[in-house]
């Protein structure tokens, strides 16, 4: 992973994240165009990243599909597909650490939201829909940025 890959990922993730927050849907074009842009960049300028990227893109949806099945389709198919773009950006070596970070960020956000709602008397059911793409994007960007920054030290 390098900074250019991270910028390409962030560019295409903005639309995915905004749409997921607003409508709980991730547009396929963001995944297809983002993946094509990342693959083109890696093939032309960063050949050393392509194997890890393809491995991450192949393994990530398997993990998210398993989560989708285990949770009785609680996770949307858009998140499963979006994991392809995430895996392609981070590579297999960083993708799963990024997903752990995404889950932690999500848990902290919703725990604080729950406590705030409890304090204000607002009621939200346990079945509330969660847009997970923002947390996936945050996890990928955080872990990849830390990885790149640590290479300068």
Segments predicted by a language model, with ranges:
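A membrane-topology feature that recognizes alpha-helical transmembrane segments
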Residues: 1-153
